[in-house]
Amino acid sequence: MALGVAAASLFATSSASSHGYTDSPISRQKLCANGTVKNCGDIQWEPQSVEGLKGFPAAGPADGRICAGGNSRFSQLDDPRGGAWPTTKVTAGQSYTFRWQFTARHATTDFRYYITKNGWTGTKALTRADLDTQPFLVVPYNNQQPPSTLSHSGTIPAGKSGKAVILAVWTIADTGNAFYACSDVQF
């Protein structure tokens, strides 16, 4: 799979106080925060706090704990819920605008986007074996701080079908951590 590198489109809005999550496609943590998904535990109040070790896929959260960034407080994000997470409709091979919302901005190494392999059913917690471990989109950020809203345009890989998860990883430059967001999609 070819590695995409994108230029970032910036849209600034006001800032609050914590970290960040994706809302396009909508992430599991945002679905919990806006009340679409119930029984989410602490993540419903802290969608911006899914922070774990950086270095994915060689390091970072353990298999089965990826969507929660390895953070046990947010383990509901790793719960497959029988494959019933709401999905965003996407088209394989088409351009898509991925969007992050930040409540605290950090010096950033890059943003990386991964997707599950065809045949993934969503009935078990996400593992590296479920993912194409080569990101389909990488957006270098050269130690800059993003604005409070940031969009990246990239192409969703061709040949994808069925259900999938897009894993977005925001790698922080000046700490050992990254932020993780899982978005359930349907082709």
What are the language-model segments listed below?
Residues 12, 107-109, 160-162, 179:
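Short loop/turn segments at connectors of secondary-structure elements within structured domains
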Residues 16-128:
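N-terminal "mature-chain" segments and other terminal, solvent-exposed stretches
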Residues 104, 118-120, 157-162, 187:
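A short, structured loop/turn motif at beta-sheet edges
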Residues 178-187:
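Short beta-strand elements
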